[in-house]
Curated annotation (Swiss-Prot):
The lineage of its organism: Eukaryota, Metazoa, Chordata, Craniata, Vertebrata. It comes from Bos taurus. It is found in: Cytoplasm. GO terms for molecular function: translation initiation factor activity. GO terms for cellular component: eukaryotic 43S preinitiation complex; eukaryotic 48S preinitiation complex; eukaryotic translation initiation factor 3 complex. One of its GO terms (biological process) is formation of cytoplasmic translation initiation complex. This is Eukaryotic translation initiation factor 3 subunit L. The gene is EIF3L. Its main location: cytoplasm.
Length: 564
């Protein structure tokens, strides 16, 4: 394959007279560096710059050395060593820093050199080229103007097949280790590209007959069954569920890991695949199954596996959303509040890496919107700092939702929900223009129906708080309802305020029926008796925190005043 003519500029720009440099591109002379970059942007012939060649050769050597060391250790029946750990650390630095910097400088909106072009530089190393293509296609999806072509979508799928076949179909453990961040990104991107293709194939209006025929004749490419098969195979190969079961009970997971699960590559891919299955089932609208795949992961306990922040944030986002759609509002609020507090306290750590910050910041905003919805439908106390953030962001919208404005509910849901998809290949002979929106519209209808059922509850709650006893007929009159309609709404109130709530145990599906409503009532003949069940707010903790903040501010001001 060759670049389209207008993409030659992506590789352009090698000045044969400039300082060749090593893979980090610095000469030490700012003027020379700037001139080099300008020449790089202006020239348009197909030559791989020396700086990129050096980087790719260094990248290949690091991966190749790691594989050689891993082969040696597998032959010696050793799981890992300090040498392997050091090589993984070097690859992590290349992956998170060097690759990102080079991309930003030379391939910001254009593709990297194709694998076929760089193959001679790396001795046609098949494993390295698979890893390189994983990064190459991911960059096209994320940054290249116009996104991937149909051909590139297919090629990326085949490359993932090659990668997973290498890992899963070897006679023994594959001689490879990769940083946890990269392993998570592989699973995350694999599902994202499946999601992207599922939506792409439904939009046929601007596609040529040739493209539609190509899609029609290849129904198994990015098929939901193949994606599920990969994720389940990685889970089974790693024996991760059994490892987690033993780990949460206080045992040694290594004792049940098996031949493959002892190795970090398989263990972490297995764990990340569980989160991938959570995400995939959520995108398909199967919320019970989404949470069930995590039955051996204890969300409320810090795990040895939660080393990748994006994985942790993604897990909580999809678990919280699944709880919301299952009408387990109290659990959804707890999950969202916990992860938002975690993000709030560790935000500075993410800001060091732009691409991580963008992803986490987006899900942070979405979870604030989902929390606003959940708290409107099921009012309860949350952490003070999260509550303040929520009031700043969505105070007005929450007031409108409390008044029963369905438009605000729909707006926040549309903004914060996942991009739902249909697992079914469309009928290409009869695809209407909005076919790709049908999965979303179906989930929106389910959500809107639930909102509609609760439309009167906020008003009823506010009236109930005003009285301790009241004739049913009189209170019905205040609400412009007949006595029968009001009794139905009271029954709805009782039903909707009773939630299945997780209390203990590992499985997130476990729980007991509870009510955290601030008011409760019972009806005796024609009288309604109301009790305020609100727990008194502990103001002491709030004032202590404010005093500590004031003292810290006072100390800072004194230090500033002492400066000459």
């Amino acid at each position: 394959m060759s670049y389209p003519a207008d993409d030659y500029e992506s590789e352009a720009a090698y000045d044969p007279y400039a300082y060749p440099g090593d893979y980090d591109m610095h000469t030490g002379d700012p003027k020379q560096d700037l001139a080099y970059e300008r020449q790089y942007e202006q020239q348009t012939y197909q030559v791989i710059p020396e700086v990129i060649k050096n980087f790719i050769q260094y990248f290949h050597k690091t991966v190749s050395d790691l594989i050689d060391q891993k082969v040696y250790e597998l032959q010696a029946s050793r799981v890992s060593s300090d040498v392997i750990d050091q090589k993984v650390y070097e690859i992590q630095d290349i992956y998170e820093n060097s690759w990102t910097k080079l991309t930003e400088r030379f391939f910001k909106n254009t593709p990297w050199p194709e694998a076929e072009t760089i193959a001679p530089q790396v001795g046609n190393d098949a494993v390295f080229l698979i890893l390189y293509k994983e990064l190459y296609y991911r960059h096209i999806y994320a940054k290249v103007s116009g996104g991937p072509s149909l051909e590139q979508r297919f090629e990326s799928y085949y490359n993932y097949c090659n990668l997973f076949n290498y890992i899963l179909n070897a006679d023994g453990p594959a001689p490879l280790e990769l940083p946890n961040q990269w392993l998570w990104d592989i699973i995350d991107e694999f599902i994202y590209q499946f999601q992207s293709f599922s939506q792409y194939r439904c939009k046929t209006a601007k596609k040529s007959e040739e493209e539609i025929d190509f899609l029609r004749s290849n129904p198994k490419i990015w098929n939901v069954h193949s994606v599920l098969n990969v994720l389940h195979s990685l889970v089974d190969k790693s024996n991760i569920n059994r490892q987690l079961e033993v780990y949460t009970s206080g045992g040694d997971p290594e004792s049940v890991a098996g031949e493959y699960g002892r190795h970090s590559l398989y263990k972490m891919l297995g764990y990340f695949s569980l989160v991938g299955l959570l995400r995939l089932h959520s995108l398909l609208g199967d919320y019970y199954q989404a949470i069930k795949v995590l039955e051996n992961i204890e969300l409320n306990k810090k795990s040895m596996y939660s080393r990748v922040p994006e994985c942790q944030v993604t897990t909580y986002y999809y678990v919280g959303f699944a709880y919301l759609m299952m009408r387990r509002y109290q659990d959804a609020i707890r999950v969202f509040a916990n992860i938002l507090l975690y993000i709030q306290r560790t935000k500075s750590m993410f800001q060091r890496t732009t691409y991580k910050y963008e992803m986490i910041n987006k899900q942070n905003e979405q979870m604030h919107a989902l929390l606003a919805i959940a708290l409107t439908m099921y009012p309860m106390r949350i952490d003070e700092s999260i509550h303040l953030q929520l009031r700043e962001k969505y105070g007005d919208k929450m007031l409108r939702m409390q008044k029963g404005d369905p438009q605000v509910y729909e707006e926040l849901f549309s903004y914060s929900c996942p991009k739902f998809l249909s697992p079914v290949v469309p009928n290409y002979d009869n695809v209407h223009p909005n076919y790709h929106k049908e999965p979303f519209l179906q989930q929106l209808k389910v959500f809107s129906d639930e909102v509609q059922q609760q439309a009167q509850l906020s008003t009823i709650r506010s009236f109930l708080k005003l009285y301790t006893t009241m004739p049913v007929a009189k209170l019905a009159g205040f609400l412009d309802l007949t006595e029968q309609e009001f009794r139905i709404q009271l029954l709805v109130f009782k039903h909707k305020m009773k939630n299945l709530v997780w209390t203990s145990g590992i499985s997130a599906l476990d729980g007991e029926f509870q009510s955290a409503s601030e008011v409760d009532f019972y009806i005796d003949k024609d009288m309604i008796h109301i009790a305020d069940t609100k727990v008194a707010r502990r103001y002491g903790d709030f004032f202590i925190r404010q005093i500590h903040k004031f003292e810290e501010l006072n100390r800072t001001l004194k230090k500033m005043g002492q400066r000459p």
